[in-house]
From Swiss-Prot:
This is Lysine--tRNA ligase. Mg(2+) 2 binds at residue 430. Homodimer. CDD domains: LysRS_core, LysRS_N. Residues 1-22 are annotated as: Disordered. Gene3D superfamilies: Bira Bifunctional Protein, Domain 2, Nucleic acid-binding proteins. It is an enzyme of class 6 (ligase). Transmembrane segments: none annotated. Residues 1-11 have a biased composition (Polar residues). It comes from the Bacteria. Mg(2+) 1 binds at residues 423, 430. It catalyses: tRNA(Lys) + L-lysine + ATP = L-lysyl-tRNA(Lys) + AMP + diphosphate. GO terms for cellular component: cytosol.
Amino acid sequence: MTEPTQPNAAQPNVVPEVDDNKIIAERREKLRELREQGVAYPNDFRPTHHAEDLQAQYEHSDKEALEANPLEVAIAGRMMLKRVMGKASFATVRDGSGQIQFFITPADVGQETYDAFKKWDMGDIVAARGVLFRTNKGELSVRCTELRLLSKSLRPLPDKFHGLSDQEMKYRQRYVDLIVTPETRKTFVARTKAISSIRKFMADADFMEVETPMLHPIPGGAAAKPFTTHHNALDMQMFLRIAPELYLKRLVVGGFERVFEINRNFRNEGVSVRHNPEFTMIEFYAAYTDYKWLMDFTEQLIRQAAIDALGTATITYQGRELDLAKPFHRLTITQAIQKYAPQYTNEQLADSAFLRTELKKFGVDASQPQFLNAGVGALQLALFEETAESQLWEPTYIIDYPIEVSPLARASDKVEGITERFELFITGREIANGFSELNDPEDQAARFRKQVDQKDAGDEEAMFYDADYIRALEYGMPPAGGCGIGIDRLVMLLTDSPSIRDVILFPHLRRED
């Protein structure tokens, strides 16, 4: 039997240009031959093992141990590398878990199968049965006794040494990116682990997962511009939801004291490294809690998601270390401004005219609709966004938001003009937004009316008046706290991803010409 000696693959410095159209034509001809033979695209092979499981289980088994206790396996996956050596050949095959090497000889699989294998291409989906062993160079491999082609790849994969270098192509053809970029696969595995962790965390805290409408007759729950659509049967305009908040709070009115939803929101706004028109959030509401309880709970949730997704609460983002195990900081808006822009005095931050003048220096147009009747609190928030927000690298809760920019939050009993609201910032990005809920129907109705006035003045992000939600509050909602966490931004943090597109499988892009 041929001794399985693994070759050293040469890595050329210059990769010659290839004609993809010619390669595709050649592969289509191979597929035509397979169709004539009646063996194209079979579906009768069932794997018994996964590559990563075998690599882990037999990591410390040497050649002699494997020969003494032979293990028969059946594995299928994509052929990522093929080396034909004459009387023996190697193939690196990747399944959904990892990769493993196939060792193929005509003596083991038959000359006809071996000759057919020589014609197969990288990217083909192949399957093998055989015995696990270790090569002379120590690589865990499958000595194939049966070898089959399950699916013909008609398009060539990107060059293995350069990968998929076009960033937009990575997003547009995510299926190719997942094939050739291990880091991309790791990112989305971590995303799934984080979401699973969050669901378990919520269940362990006695929250009930629910589903609320995606199509809303009135957009609400956040300050954002909605997507609009038309319901033909009802002949009415509808809106893709910008947030599930008002429906979830209706459920609290109905007696479900702890509810949460993980789902998509849609906002018809700009696209950036932090924004995608379609994004995933968790929103949760708990009766008989307040914003202080929410901050503690949210901190624990994020910490546990990191541990479950990565195995640690200490992470690195863009070259800087973050310890999510440490208590999160808490600052008011003015404290944050003065921490990162200490030149501002308390008197200046309480002066509307000064704030408007200062905002102009940062290029903020104070004549915009949302600023026309803005008070000191809203102007302070705008200055915070210019001076401090991007500096909040360590996890920091910004608390005590002004009432005029918090139409759904409970007003403070201690300080006039502010609410029991927080936003959580990590690496200079907003990750979460929460508050003690406003459950006074008359106060809520008055705030909705102010929002309508702002909308009439030209503020497209101001809220509508939701009469049914007011009616729900009039039945009585218990005191409660609620919070929303951006799943995509959290996963960006956990996976060291600089753009939100890196953590969304199919982000929105301009249509191809």
